């Protein structure tokens, strides 16, 4: 049984809870991360979440997301998860933090997360995605993604839409 780290509104660890339970009944505030990996052309590696994911399945999103395990650091967890989902590792650097709440009306589950945003550079243009996690992937320019999320918002996860509209993602690509 997987557990997530429960946090207070300032992101301080206060306990643990079973993963699915933390996403039920409107969600419990827990620790998470969102990874953005760019290639040398400044394009972002996007993923379409696999149809088998327990919530927000089939939607396009940032490179990967996840939860640190109890006792695991955020950067360590993000680098681990990137390897699990895309088959490569790279050094990740924190650039932002945000709290968000989003309900998946198809499953009745919710995300209520204190999330760290980390960025990195891809060591390859040809990742090896895990098909149980990732239904499709592509490289895309941040400005194209920003326009697409405005025109077709329901194609994207709610946290990714918020980040792509509110954060300087194009600057992260060149930073």
From Swiss-Prot:
Any Pfam family: NUDIX
Enzyme class: isomerase
One annotated GO molecular function: isopentenyl-diphosphate delta-isomerase activity
Signal sequence range: none
Annotated residues for binding of Mn(2+): 23, 30, 67, 111, 113
Entry's Gene Ontology cellular component terms: cytoplasm
Alphabetically ordered keywords of this record: Cytoplasm, Isomerase, Isoprene biosynthesis, Magnesium, Manganese, Metal-binding
Gene3D superfamilies referenced in this protein's UniProt entry, alphabetically: Nucleoside Triphosphate Pyrophosphohydrolase
Superkingdom of origin organism: Bacteria
Catalytic residues, chain numbering: 65, 113
InterPro entries associated with the record: Idi_bact, IsopentenylPP_isomerase_typ1, NUDIX_hydrolase-like_dom_sf, NUDIX_hydrolase_dom
Cofactor note: Binds 1 Mg(2+) ion per subunit. The magnesium ion binds only when substrate is bound.
Pathways per UniProt: Isoprenoid biosynthesis; dimethylallyl diphosphate biosynthesis; dimethylallyl diphosphate from isopentenyl diphosphate: step 1/1
SUPFAM superfamilies documented for this protein: Nudix
Catalytic activity: isopentenyl diphosphate = dimethylallyl diphosphate
Protein task: Catalyzes the 1,3-allylic rearrangement of the homoallylic substrate isopentenyl (IPP) to its highly electrophilic allylic isomer, dimethylallyl diphosphate (DMAPP).
NCBIfam families, per database record: IPP_isom_1, PRK03759.1
Protein name: Isopentenyl-diphosphate Delta-isomerase
Organism: Halorhodospira halophila (strain DSM 244 / SL1)
């Amino acid at each position: 049984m997987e557990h997530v780290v429960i946090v207070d509104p300032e992101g301080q660890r206060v306990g643990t809870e079973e993963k699915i339970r933390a996403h039920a009944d409107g969600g419990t505030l827990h620790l998470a991360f969102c990874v953005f990996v760019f290639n040398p052309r400044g394009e972002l590696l996007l993923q379409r979440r696999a149809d088998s994911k327990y919530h927000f399945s089939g939607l396009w999103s940032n490179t990967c997301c996840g939860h640190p395990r109890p006792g695991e650091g955020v950067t360590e967890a993000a680098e681990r998860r990137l390897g699990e989902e895309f088959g490569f590792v790279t050094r990740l650097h924190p650039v932002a933090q945000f709290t968000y709440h989003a309900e998946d009306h198809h499953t009745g589950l919710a995300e209520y997360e204190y999330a760290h945003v980390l960025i990195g550079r891809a060591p390859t243009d040809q990742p090896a995605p895990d098909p149980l996690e990732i239904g499709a992937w592509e490289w895309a320019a941040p400005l194209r993604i920003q326009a697409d999320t405005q025109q077709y918002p329901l194609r994207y996860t709610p946290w990714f839409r918020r980040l792509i509209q509110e954060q300087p993602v194009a600057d992260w690509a060149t930073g």
